[in-house]
């Protein structure tokens, strides 16, 4: 079964080989909230969602955060453990209004459009398992996405910053 977000962009043979090295979750259904944590549901249970926290400082300073493929080689294995959350086909409930979509590099390892919440791009940690504690938090890098998290200001907004 092909995931709808991958079917919309044809994969070249080379890109298909690159993608096969990294598992891609295709069983994502809807959003849910557990406590204050935003999660995505799967047939086996919910998975926690994460945000990349350095993005806020980059946006406030007018800088661009590169895709993982553009990072130094020694950082890629760490970054590839986080999968950009694909745009979900249908989302219901009170938090659907905060969802958005951002395009990604169509030539990269993860070419699908990415789901955002309050402007924050959302990520899955590839080693998390439904029903178990979240394992992908890394202080000052990846934090659990909370429903009360202030929205990420658009790039170039005046009046924000350190």
Predicted regions and their residues:
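Compact beta-sheet-dominated domain cores in extracellular/mature segments
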Residues: 1-162
């Amino acid at each position: 079964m092909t995931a709808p977000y991958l079917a919309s962009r044809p994969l070249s043979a080379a890109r298909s080989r690159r993608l096969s090295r990294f598992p891609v979750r295709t069983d994502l259904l809807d959003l849910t909230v557990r406590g204050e944590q935003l999660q995505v549901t799967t047939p086996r249970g919910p998975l926690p969602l994460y945000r990349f926290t350095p993005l806020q400082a980059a946006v406030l300073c007018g800088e661009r955060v590169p895709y993982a493929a553009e990072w130094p080689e020694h950082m890629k294995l760490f970054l590839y453990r986080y999968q950009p959350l694909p745009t979900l086909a249908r989302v219901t409930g009170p938090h659907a209004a905060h969802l958005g979509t951002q395009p990604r590099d169509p030539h990269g390892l993860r070419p699908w459009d990415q789901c955002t919440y309050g402007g924050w791009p959302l990520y899955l940690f590839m080693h998390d398992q439904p029903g178990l504690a979240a394992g992908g938090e890394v202080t000052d890098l990846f934090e659990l996405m909370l429903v009360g998290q202030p929205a990420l200001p658009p790039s170039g907004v005046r009046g924000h910053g350190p």
